[in-house]
Every structure is written in structure tokens, then in C-alpha cells.
Amino acid sequence: MFASKPAKAYVFFLANPQPQNASSQDMETYPELMMQQVQSLSLILTREANDLTQAQCDVMLNGESTGILVPGHILEAAVQVNDQRYILFLTDDVIFEESLTIALIDVHDGLKEIVRLGNEYSTGSFADLQITDDSVNFRFIGDYIWTVEVSDSPRLHLPFISDPKGLKRESGLKKYIAISATPSPENIS
């Protein structure tokens, strides 16, 4: 009367299978990629700037389109954070009102976050890029050294409290990019 259904088979895969009695010396380790400046990224202009909006560009990785669109016209620098994430430092080449756009992109997940550094009628010049294992330092506006750190997962962002003056980001309670500004050593008396 009743047809029997075939038994279901379940297969489980462990993300990181490890022998239960293996010591840390037996385990193979892989070094993490340290932040580094790269030349493998470039931009292709998709929309010119106008009075109301920044220029927009498609991000190219090794000459291939990523499909990721970012605001800005000039790629000042690109820093590889890990095997799929990059920090882009972008400007629009606007005299007397230059601002810096910092974009975090993920080649698999697209644009993760954008922050902007600058104010009306202020000029800045991107300079002195220095990269450590977990941060990027540079100069842009004023006599400050700006430091950018990126987290793997979003962190709590408290609007109006946690960012230095001149930094703008979209409203929300999460961030991947943390930015701080410290007076440059030659200006401390």
C-alpha cells in the first residue's frame, strides 16, 4: 500500500577539521597577509563629476573589471588588506576644495564602506603614505598624521563622538574603517 521512501543520507563537512589529539606544533599554519601597497588596481571613469556629485569609476583589478563603482576620479593609492579586501584613497582633482574619499572594497562582496575627509574651502594633498601590519598612515589636511585601521567585521560606530573633525561617513551604527588623527611630531612643542 505505502511506497517506502529511500533513506536520506546526510553528509557533514567540518570547516577546519583537526585531529583531536593534534598539538599546535603538528598543525600547519598559514601566515596572514600583511597590509601592502599594490599597483594592481586602477580606475575607469564611468561618470564625470558635476556640481552635485563626485565622479564615479569602475575598479579594475589586474585589468579586469570588478563591477565595483566608487566615487572619485584619481586613485592616489591602493592598499591590500587581505586576499580580497582593499583600501582605496581617491580624490577628484578639484582645486581649492580637495577632499579625500577612502573606500573599503571586497572583491567578492563589493563596496563595504566609504568615508570622506575634508571640509569646504580646505585644500589637502595626499602624502607620506606609510603602511604597518595593521594600519595605514598618511597626511592630507592640516598638520596631522591620519591613521586608518580596518576590521574584518563591523564594529559599533557612535555618530558625532568617535570620528575626528573633518571626517564624514554615512549615518549608521556600524563601521569597518576606524580613523584617527594625531598632530605630526614636528608640530608638537
Regions found by a protein language model. Name each.
Residues 49-54, 95-98:
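Short, solvent-exposed loop/turn segments at conserved positions within beta-propeller repeat blades
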Residues 28-46, 130-189:
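Acidic, small-residue rich beta-repeat scaffolds with periodic aromatic anchors
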Residues 64-69, 113-116:
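A short beta-strand motif characteristic of beta-propeller blades
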Residues 53-63:
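Short polybasic amphipathic segments
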Residues 96-103, 144-149:
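Structural motif
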Residues 71-81, 120-129, 167-172:
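Repeated scaffold domains used in trafficking and secretory/extracellular systems
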